[in-house]
């Protein structure tokens, strides 16, 4: 957040975090992940993630509701909408990991919400609710101008490290990758595989949870602009990655969109394109899952062999796994 806003609201925010959020979390031994972690948001994985069901108060003019975190077509969707009969005028979604993550490279593929007065985010956080100091690293999109991303971080409650990066595109129009590499003496921020900013002062040290949320501001019009009450608004997320050893091969996911494989023979059907639209993307992944669950008995393409992505003569879960690895860029082609 803006330093000028934090200076005015720090005390109330800390009080709300400790009084309101803490009761919803029981103190447990922290599980810190130290191996590569990839989450593709095709469905709700309650073993790894949780949907918030409380209110932060202070500058957050909404209550978090599990109903506002949904999954469709290979995406996790956070929806900001009206809340009737409650203590807050709006409800929205927050999704957070159950485990903690420390130094390493973090990446998300997402599409931000666009509207004055709101924030779409990807960040790590720990604080009083986890019996830890407040340490946080943020990538935020202010809905009033989604051609920019705001980077920030906190160490032991001290922020004021905001940097506003001009993206060169509108983050609300398409999916792009955003990431940061967190090390003891610096944080490097990435956009579509390119390092765009390095921070070196007051670097946080405490492992935190991976979080995403969408919220309307209250009392921070100078920062976000005055929210006009427009609903519904959505931020969408395709995946999250974490690599403790840093940026994979010194090059995070470089491509802002999922490009289809190009067959050697252009007359051959495109492997993995099970819906026949000429592209291989999350819609094919969702359709493939329905086939394996026997919700459908065939794919809507003439040549069913497009689903045999590993070319072993069978269509099974091995093909789905390979398709998933392609979509998260773990393999370059099918």
From Swiss-Prot:
Segments forming domain Dockerin: 267-334
Superkingdom of the source species: Bacteria
Alphabetical GO biological process terms: polysaccharide catabolic process
Reaction(s) the record says it catalyses: Hydrolysis of (1->4)-beta-D-glucosidic linkages in beta-D-glucans containing (1->3)- and (1->4)-bonds
Secretion signal, residue range per the UniProt entry: 1-27
Region described as Disordered: 246-265
Matches recorded under Pfam families: Dockerin_1 (PF00404), Glyco_hydro_16 (PF00722)
Positions annotated as active site in the UniProt record: 136, 140
SUPFAM superfamilies hit by this protein: Concanavalin A-like lectins/glucanases, Type I dockerin domain
A GO term, aspect molecular function: licheninase activity
Residue ranges occupied by any GH16 domain in the UniProt entry: 28-248
EC numbers, comma separated: 3.2.1.73
UniProt keyword Hydrolase, yes or no: yes
Keywords: Glycosidase, Hydrolase, Signal
Family named by the database record: Belongs to the glycosyl hydrolase 16 family.
PANTHER family in alphabetical order: XYLOGLUCAN ENDOTRANSGLUCOSYLASE/HYDROLASE PROTEIN 8-RELATED
Protein name in UniProt: Beta-glucanase
Gene name per UniProt: licB
């Amino acid at each position: 957040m803006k330093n000028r806003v934090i200076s005015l609201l720090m005390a109330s925010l800390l009080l709300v975090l400790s009084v309101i959020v803490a009761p919803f979390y029981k103190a447990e031994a922290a599980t810190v992940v130290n191996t590569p972690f990839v989450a593709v948001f095709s469905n709700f994985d309650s073993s790894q993630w949780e949907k918030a069901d409380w209110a932060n108060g202070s500058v957050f003019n909404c209550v978090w509701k599990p109903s506002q975190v949904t999954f469709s077509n290979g995406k996790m969707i956070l929806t900001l909408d009206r809340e009737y009969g409650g203590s807050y005028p709006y409800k929205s979604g927050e999704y957070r990991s159950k485990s903690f993550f420390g130094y390493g490279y973090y990446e998300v593929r997402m599409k931000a919400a666009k509207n004055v007065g709101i924030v779409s985010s990807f960040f790590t956080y720990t604080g009083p609710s986890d019996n830890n100091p407040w340490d946080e690293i943020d990538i935020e999109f202010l809905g009033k101008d989604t051609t920019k991303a705001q980077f920030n971080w906190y160490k032991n409650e001290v922020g004021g490290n905001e940097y506003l990066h001009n993206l060169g595109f509108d983050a609300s129009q398409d999916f792009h990758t955003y990431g940061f590499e967190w090390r003891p003496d610096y944080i490097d921020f990435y956009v579509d595989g390119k390092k765009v900013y390095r921070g070196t002062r007051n670097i946080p040290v405490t492992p935190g949870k991976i979080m995403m949320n969408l919220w309307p501001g209250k009392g921070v019009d100078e920062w976000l602009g005055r929210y006009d009450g427009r609903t519904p608004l959505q931020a969408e997320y395709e995946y999250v990655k974490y690599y403790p050893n840093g940026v994979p091969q010194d090059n995070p996911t470089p491509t802002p969109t999922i490009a289809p494989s190009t067959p050697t023979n252009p007359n051959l059907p495109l492997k993995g394109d099970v819906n026949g639209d000429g592209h291989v993307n999350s819609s094919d992944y969702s359709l493939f899952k329905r086939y394996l669950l026997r919700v459908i008995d065939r794919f809507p393409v003439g040549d069913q062999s497009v689903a045999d992505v590993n070319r072993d003569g069978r269509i099974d879960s091995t093909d789905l796994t390979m398709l998933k690895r392609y979509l998260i860029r773990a393999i370059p082609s099918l």
